[in-house]
């Protein structure tokens, strides 16, 4: 039991540390992605003067209007959120994975499905702990100073102000808008993110590629891109719902949000910011590869071993 508890803490710390570093490095891409993704909601609310023309234009415009440091706006909330989220994801994923206990050689597809299920379940459990921080990070990142030409005032002064104003206008429920569809999205994303990586790792990272950080990074990048694109429309819906807390007009449900976006903006609007999301996947790949590297150092685990 003592050994299991020690391994759990190592999983918790290794996952959280690698996540915090990677997310901070990718914070500028993350903010650009969120701005492009939610720009139509911001324009409707009068929080954005004109739409962004692409990743480059959004980056340049944000720096020009708000300063270089603004690219990290919302990152503090993201690190606070992401450390326990990713740490719990990794730690619980291994707990859930051991519950299935299928043999990879004798029952490959059951083992594969077990990896998918354990990754999804870990993500859903973790989300319930830190959703309000994800909401706060989204609102801060989309709080642009371009509501009118020449710049405008911020809607929020910081993390605490997001909580204060949201609770004042919408109550606690305002912090959890979009939670249900987020649970669906997190199961899809984490299920692919962890399940595919753990399933492909012992198959791909063998021989000369075993313990190869670059190979692990590239595999993680590919998995992160695939998982991100598969769940991206769900991510757009949940964040658009988050953006309506504090506004007069809200979506009745996630399905209503989906209908309104498709009807008024077209299907392509569900994928706005997906290009930046692919660049952001570098951070996700770094988390996966870095986590494995830390486990090699701390526990003696190997990339290709497939060990829990």
Swiss-Prot record:
Catalytic activity entry: ADP(in) + ATP(out) = ADP(out) + ATP(in)
A biological-process GO annotation: mitochondrial ATP transmembrane transport
Superkingdom, natural source: Eukaryota
Record-level Gene Ontology MF annotations: ATP:ADP antiporter activity
Matching PANTHER family: ADP,ATP CARRIER PROTEIN 1-RELATED-RELATED, ADP_ATP TRANSLOCASE
Function: ADP:ATP antiporter that mediates import of ADP into the mitochondrial matrix for ATP synthesis, and export of ATP out to fuel the cell. Cycles between the cytoplasmic-open state (c-state) and the matrix-open state (m-state): operates by the alternating access mechanism with a single substrate-binding site intermittently exposed to either the cytosolic (c-state) or matrix (m-state) side of the inner mitochondrial membrane.
Subunit and partners: Monomer.
Identification of the protein by name: ADP,ATP carrier protein
Organism: Chlamydomonas reinhardtii
């Amino acid at each position: 039991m003592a050994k299991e508890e020690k391994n759990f803490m190592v999983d918790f710390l290794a996952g959280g540390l690698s996540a915090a570093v990677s997310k901070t490095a990718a914070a500028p891409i993350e903010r650009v992605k969120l701005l492009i993704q939610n720009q139509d909601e911001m324009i409707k609310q009068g929080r954005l003067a004109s739409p962004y023309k692409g990743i480059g234009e959004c980056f340049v415009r944000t720096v020009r209007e708000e300063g270089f440091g603004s690219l990290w706006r919302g990152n503090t909330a993201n690190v606070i959120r992401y450390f326990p989220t990713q740490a719990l994801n990794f730690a619980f994923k291994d707990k859930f994975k051991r519950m299935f206990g299928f043999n990879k050689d004798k029952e490959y597809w059951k083992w594969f499905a077990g990896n998918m299920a354990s990754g999804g379940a870990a993500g859903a459990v973790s989300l319930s702990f830190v959703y309000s921080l994800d909401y706060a990070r989204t609102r801060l990142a989309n709080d642009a100073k371009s509501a009118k030409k020449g710049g405008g005032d911020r809607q929020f002064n910081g993390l605490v102000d997001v909580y204060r104003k949201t609770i004042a206008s919408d109550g606690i429920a305002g912090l959890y808008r979009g939670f249900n569809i987020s649970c669906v999205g997190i199961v899809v994303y984490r299920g692919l993110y962890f399940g595919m990586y753990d399933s492909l790792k012992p198959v791909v990272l063998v021989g000369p590629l075993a313990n190869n950080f670059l190979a692990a990074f590239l595999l993680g990048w590919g998995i992160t891109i695939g998982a991100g694109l598969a769940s991206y429309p769900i991510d757009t819906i949940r964040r658009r719902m988050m953006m309506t807390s504090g506004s007069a007009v809200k979506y009745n449900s996630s399905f209503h949000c989906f209908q309104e976006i498709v009807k008024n903006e077209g299907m392509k609007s569900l994928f706005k910011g997906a290009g930046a999301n692919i660049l952001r996947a570098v951070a996700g790949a770094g988390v996966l590869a870095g986590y494995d590297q830390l486990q090699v150092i701390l526990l003696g685990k190997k990339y290709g071993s497939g060990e829990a």
